[in-house]
Design a protein with these regions (language model features):
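Active-site hotspot residues in diverse enzymes, especially metal/ion-binding acidic/histidine motifs
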Residues: 1-171
């Protein structure tokens, strides 16, 4: 169903990321919840079937008064979903807002330009802070895979991050 989409507010990025991170932790009805949250922030959200020949995870563009984010669920796992979503959100706020003719498409294996690199970095840091992650890895560099699994569980719980997202980072 089409939701009413609010006006887009270019100063709401931090709030939006916090709200999405809460949603990733719970990870129930995630697609509907994403649509609902994004519409409140003035962003249209669409899921399309993955493309056969092209490894596209998502794309974003401006449509009328609002930005639109499209995800393909090519890799149907919460860590990929969260990353792809935050990647496109970064494009919306940092690139599309000032240049509405532009379109961004995330294709796996494509040559990475500065905009894509920035969006990747933002998505990663929004899910798990860089310093937090590096500290975790340093502390647990010498432990067995089984022990690491326990540490990942603890880390996820302690920092209120979805366990599968932490695991995705680790792999």
């Amino acid at each position: 169903q089409m939701l009413d989409v609010a006006d887009f507010d270019e100063n709401s990025l931090e709030r939006l990321v916090q709200e999405l991170n809460q949603m990733f932790v719970v990870n129930i009805n995630t697609i509907d919840k994403t649509k609902e949250i994004l519409s409140r922030y003035g962003i249209k959200f669409i899921i399309v079937p993955k493309f056969d020949k092209t490894p596209i995870d998502g794309f974003s563009f401006w449509q009328g008064k609002n930005p639109t984010i499209v995800l393909t669920l090519r890799l149907n796992k919460i860590d990929n979903y969260a990353f792809a979503l935050l990647h496109e959100i970064y494009h919306v706020y940092m690139h599309l807002f000032n240049n509405r003719e532009q379109k961004y498409i995330a294709i796996e294996g494509a040559e990475i330009n500065k905009c894509e690199e920035e969006a990747n970095k933002f998505a990663k840091c929004s899910l798990i802070g860089k310093d937090l992650w590096n500290t975790f890895l340093k502390q647990h560099s010498m432990i067995s895979p089984h022990a690491m699994q326990m540490k990942i569980k603890q880390f996820a719980h302690q920092h209120n991050i979805n366990e599968a997202i932490v695991l995705g980072f680790y792999q």
